Amino acid sequence: MAPPAARLALLSAAALTLAARPAPSPGLGPECFTANGADYRGTQNWTALQGGKPCLFWNETFQHPYNTLKYPNGEGGLGEHNYCRNPDGDVSPWCYVAEHEDGVYWKYCEIPACQMPGNLGCYKDHGNPPPLTGTSKTSNKLTIQTCISFCRSQRFKFAGMESGYACFCGNNPDYWKYGEAASTECNSVCFGDHTQPCGGDGRIILFDTLVGACGGNYSAMSSVVYSPDFPDTYATGRVCYWTIRVPGASHIHFSFPLFDIRDSADMVELLDGYTHRVLARFHGRSRPPLSFNVSLDFVILYFFSDRINQAQGFAVLYQAVKEELPQERPAVNQTVAEVITEQANLSVSAARSSKVLYVITTSPSHPPQTVPGSNSWAPPMGAGSHRVEGWTVYGLATLLILTVTAIVAKILLHVTFKSHRVPASGDLRDCHQPGTSGEIWSIFYKPSTSISIFKKKLKGQSQQDDRNPLVSD
């Protein structure tokens, strides 16, 4: 059954970002996604990291079946190197060695990094009790997936294969209790597929039963989703859905380390988990890019196969990313500085006065409620009142009054030395001579900088303006 035509859609540029990325460095993740390591492209060139033998170069093994002369285009990963490879689809990577043992001129490679996700490892089995104690069966057509499917149908978490024909199921969290064995000790071929490893004599290879399931729900930050029936070829007429939902993720990074779909009618789709809109579609004639990002935290993975042309399938590796949002900074007040102007008249030597003009401005880098250089909070001023509330403002006012008093005292001393008589109040109205006695002083105070004093001449003077600058009408 073909997928609904309604899901035929264009790629969403807003939700899907294609981006080529470099391959992961060795040791940062799994280097194999197949059960037999046919996809291994690592750089191990010894049969074992400890006590192993060096591998021969593939371009120097012309006397053997596999070499660069016979496979010059890099088939099977061969080349001018001596890295372990699996060009013939054996149960694990191998290489030619110089020292023959009983006429054997090659050896399997023990590669810790070449273990497909879902493969829990190779373990010892002493038999009483076995590592998995749920149920078991034997079959002369056993494969990895037939054993996994059998255990999954019985609601078990783990499936184990031993000696190529025995299948064990269980939920035992201590399946490792008898000890772990080298992966090469579980290389007995499955009776149903000679390219798959199915344990060994007294050795059991374990798998998670989620491997190869048709559908599932994923919420972990990262995981691998395999095509149905993996590592066997996917069956005909498959329609499978997997949900990948990681709340809080800013985007999910996807890559296809394995993609073997040969029919254009068989397809893999990524859908928006909320709207079910198709974000991307891949099939035999449209392969996925190396990697890409989906800017969602909820994605549905869909797979459809028709009734012909089966293949190996796919492995999808996803990694959710949660980005911490930067803390919001308080808004900077960019408005015009609020100017509070108050006038004060001070009597100087019998009605000789000087007026003080206060201009308090806000610093562009501070909100108007905050006095620069102080942690105190000052409440906002009323629209119809010149009175400023708050202890901080009173402190500033006191400082200004003291400053003005000092200036006035200095003026008085200057006037006293230059004049020996104090004019009467009536004479002040007719006094127009220039000098400091008839000049008005203005002080502009900016909290963020300093106090500047300059002279400002006023045309009209009134003795009725002798008021405290902080007292309103």
Curated annotation (Swiss-Prot):
Residues 214-321 form the CUB domain. This is Kremen protein 1. It is a single-pass type I membrane protein. Forms a ternary complex with DKK1 and LRP6. Interacts with LRP6 in a DKK1-dependent manner. Interacts with DKK1 and RSPO1 (via FU repeats). The keyword Cell membrane applies. Glycans are attached at N45, N59, N217, N293, N333, N345. It comes from Homo sapiens. Residues 414-473 are annotated as: Essential for apoptotic activity. One of its GO terms (biological process) is apoptotic process. CDD domains: CUB (cd00041), KR (cd00108). Residues 1-19 form the signal peptide. One of its GO terms (cellular component) is membrane. Residues 414-473 are cytoplasmic. PROSITE patterns: CUB (PS01180), KRINGLE_1 (PS00021), KRINGLE_2 (PS50070), WSC (PS51212). Receptor for Dickkopf proteins. Cooperates with DKK1/2 to inhibit Wnt/beta-catenin signaling by promoting the endocytosis of Wnt receptors LRP5 and LRP6. In the absence of DKK1, potentiates Wnt-beta-catenin signaling by maintaining LRP5 or LRP6 at the cell membrane. Can trigger apoptosis in a Wnt-independent manner and this apoptotic activity is inhibited upon binding of the ligand DKK1. Plays a role in limb development; attenuates Wnt signaling in the developing limb to allow normal limb patterning and can also negatively regulate bone formation. It is linked to Ectodermal dysplasia 13, hair/tooth type: A form of ectodermal dysplasia, a disorder due to abnormal development of two or more ectodermal structures. ECTD13 is an autosomal recessive form characterized by severe oligodontia accompanied by anomalies of hair and skin. One of its GO terms (molecular function) is transmembrane signaling receptor activity. The chain crosses the membrane at residues 393-413. SMART domains: CUB, KR, WSC. Residues 116-210 form the WSC domain.
